[in-house]
């Protein structure tokens, strides 16, 4: 079955959206539904999971035999390759079950253990069907109802949310390591000018080096 094509980009608030003074824009966009973690701990999705944090959100279900285990394995690899120093500190990962009727906290914990995903800053959530569908519709809805109702079409798709600066990005867990890391970097808080100029110089050096080696910029 073909997975739906993913377009990447920054999330924007709907026209006319406004917030009360002192209230995050994300608080008006993200459901604050009650979920339970793999440790059976009750959490509110916005207040306890998203608020004040930079969070990668991905959908899955435990008995999935297609994209879910591959996406989980991919994120475990990224954790060990590059994300471990940040996870649980200024970067978090959360997987939300698409089949909450089957995936209670114990099932999610078993899934996480099987895939070596019980890692710092990484949570697995389950909740009521209505709340899961509301969350999925907010983050990963598709105009075609048949595609939208197929759980496999949502597995592996990721939303990177940065609450403090009010931005979110679409990403795909199956993209290259560099691409996923670039999406995470794009959602990071803005850097100071001197640091941005330094990063730009490094990027230009890499582009120049790739041109010499390959005759074009290599995409890894």
Predicted regions and their residues:
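Structural microenvironment flanking redox-active thiols in thiol-disulfide oxidoreductases
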Residues: 71-135
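Short active-site neighborhood of thiol/selenol oxidoreductases, capturing the structured segment around
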Residues: 45-71, 75
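Twin-arginine (Tat) signal peptide motif
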Residues: 1-7
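Non-globular targeting/processing and membrane-anchoring segments
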Residues: 7-11, 16-45, 174-220
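Short, small/polar residue-rich loop motifs at catalytic or cofactor-binding pockets
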Residues: 28-29, 53-54, 153-155
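A mature extracytoplasmic/lumenal domain signature
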Residues: 47-49, 60-63, 97-100, 126-128, ...
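Thiol/selenol-based redox catalytic cores and closely related redox-interacting motifs
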Residues: 118-179, 185, 193
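Soluble periplasmic/extracytoplasmic beta-strand elements of cell-envelope proteins
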Residues: 56-58, 93-97, 157-160
């Amino acid at each position: 079955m073909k997975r739906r094509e993913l377009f990447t980009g920054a999330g924007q608030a709907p026209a006319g959206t406004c917030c009360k003074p002192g209230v995050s824009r994300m608080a008006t966009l993200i459901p604050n539904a009650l979920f339970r973690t793999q440790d059976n701990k009750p959490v509110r999705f916005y207040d306890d999971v998203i608020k004040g944090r930079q969070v990668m959100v991905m959908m899955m279900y435990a008995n999935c035999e297609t994209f879910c285990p591959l996406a989980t394995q991919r994120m475990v690899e990224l954790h060990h390759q590059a994300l471990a120093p940040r996870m649980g500190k200024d970067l978090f990962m959360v997987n939300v079950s698409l089949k909450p009727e089957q995936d209670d906290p114990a099932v999610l914990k078993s899934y996480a253990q099987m895939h070596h995903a019980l890692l710092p800053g990484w949570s697995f959530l389950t909740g009521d069907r209505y709340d899961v569908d509301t969350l999925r519709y907010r983050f990963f809805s598709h105009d075609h109802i048949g595609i939208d109702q197929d759980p496999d079409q949502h597995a592996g798709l990721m939303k990177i949310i940065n609450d403090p600066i009010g931005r979110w990005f679409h990403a795909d867990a199956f993209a290259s390591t560099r691409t996923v890391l670039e999406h995470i970097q794009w959602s990071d808080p803005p850097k100071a000018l001197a640091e941005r100029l330094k990063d730009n110089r490094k990027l230009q050096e890499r582009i120049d080096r790739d041109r010499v080696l390959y005759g074009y910029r290599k995409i890894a």
